[in-house]
Amino acid sequence: MGGSELEELKKYITNIPDFPAKGIIFRDVTSLLQSGEGFSAAVDEMLKQLDDIEFDAVLGLEARGFLFGAPVAYAKKKSFVPVRKKGKLPRATVSAEYELEYGKAEVEIHTDSLKKGDKVVIIDDLIATGGTLEAAAKLVEQLGAEVVRIVCLIELTDLKGREKLKKYDVRSIVNYEGK
């Protein structure tokens, strides 16, 4: 897909003004998921972002990162590692904190989900402030693995999440200005 074709993906993403708060435009990917053509195009574009690298596993962030990460892992015949909110995984885990607007939250993965030296791709639907993605990268590094790329469908460029992730190779498919 070229630039204009990538912009075509935007037609599948519904913009919801003033949600969850006044002045915010929510970029709703569920409308993209409801379109076989849109969903396929989005996953295909994510796959293209990985053609030039070798990797062992795909890490997907709860919850919408699962929706894009799992098909990418399947297509590339790689393992899929779910990043969950703290307390949702049944076996031994490692965790990492990240900042919320008012407080902190934690995400975790199983300690046996990655091996030392594994090369990992992180997939999510959206880069906003970058906090959750940064926490996911820390989980990978705690287990001695390496983040080789981060791929997201949407980037909210005005929130400058990419700055928090500057030590990583970050790719986004479509960009939006504003919050």
Q: Can you annotate each of these PLM segments?
A:
Residues E5, K11, A135-K179:
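PRPP-dependent phosphoribosyltransferase catalytic core
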Residues D44-E97:
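Conserved PRPP/pyrophosphate-binding segment of the phosphoribosyltransferase/PRPP-pathway fold
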Residues D125, G130:
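Conserved G/P- and acidic residue-centered "switch" motifs that form tight phosphate/ATP-binding loops
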